[in-house]
């Protein structure tokens, strides 16, 4: 029989930089998970994606064992990296902070495809363009 799930924890952690300090420690400590075991495994799995924030879904079982799934980085993080900016615009309708080429948007959409519920790359591109628009980033051809 399959192990009984007692908790699902969703976190966004910088790649290769998980440590027992907040937010990781308290979230996993409540579930009774071996925090250092998770940190070592997460850091090993995400070492090649340094500098990006990686969403992770941790499933905790009754016997306090766990499994986790890493997702693709949020579109906003990938857009900020592509545009070379620290943060988006506070007033995206008035202040535009950067421009990104459409081929870069396609690249981001292809990266995000496994996590998006889009039927095609074009639909995924529209989702990424929407995220860019709400951050004050202009898309140009």
Curated annotation (Swiss-Prot):
The keyword Ribosomal protein applies. Keywords: Methylation, Ribonucleoprotein, Ribosomal protein, RNA-binding, rRNA-binding. Gene3D superfamilies: Ribosomal protein L11, C-terminal domain, Ribosomal protein L11/L12, N-terminal domain. The keyword Ligase does not apply. InterPro entries: Ribosomal_uL11, Ribosomal_uL11_bac-typ, Ribosomal_uL11_C, Ribosomal_uL11_C_sf, Ribosomal_uL11_N, Ribosomal_uL11_N_sf. GO terms for biological process: translation. One of its GO terms (cellular component) is cytosolic large ribosomal subunit. It comes from the Bacteria. It holds the Pfam family Ribosomal_L11_N. Disulfide bonds: none annotated. GO terms for molecular function: large ribosomal subunit rRNA binding; structural constituent of ribosome. One or more lysine residues are methylated. Forms part of the ribosomal stalk which helps the ribosome interact with GTP-bound translation factors. HAMAP family: Ribosomal_uL11. Belongs to the universal ribosomal protein uL11 family. NCBIfam families: L11_bact. Part of the ribosomal stalk of the 50S ribosomal subunit. Interacts with L10 and the large rRNA to form the base of the stalk. L10 forms an elongated spine to which L12 dimers bind in a sequential fashion forming a multimeric L10(L12)X complex. This is Large ribosomal subunit protein uL11A.
């Amino acid at each position: 029989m399959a192990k009984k799930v007692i908790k699902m924890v969703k976190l966004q952690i910088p790649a290769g930089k998980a440590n027992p300090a907040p937010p990781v420690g308290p979230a996993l400590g409540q579930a009774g998970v071996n925090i250092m075991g998770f940190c070592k495994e997460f850091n090993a799995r995400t070492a090649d994606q340094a500098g990006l924030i990686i969403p992770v879904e941790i499933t905790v079982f009754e016997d306090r064992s766990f499994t986790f799934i890493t997702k693709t980085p949020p579109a906003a993080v990938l857009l900020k990296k592509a545009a070379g900016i620290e943060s988006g615009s506070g007033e995206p309708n008035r202040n535009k902070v950067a421009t990104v080429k459409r081929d870069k948007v396609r690249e981001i959409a292809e990266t995000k495809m496994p996590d998006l519920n889009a039927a095609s790359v074009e639909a995924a591109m529209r989702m990424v363009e929407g995220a860019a628009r709400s951050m004050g980033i202009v898309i140009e051809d």
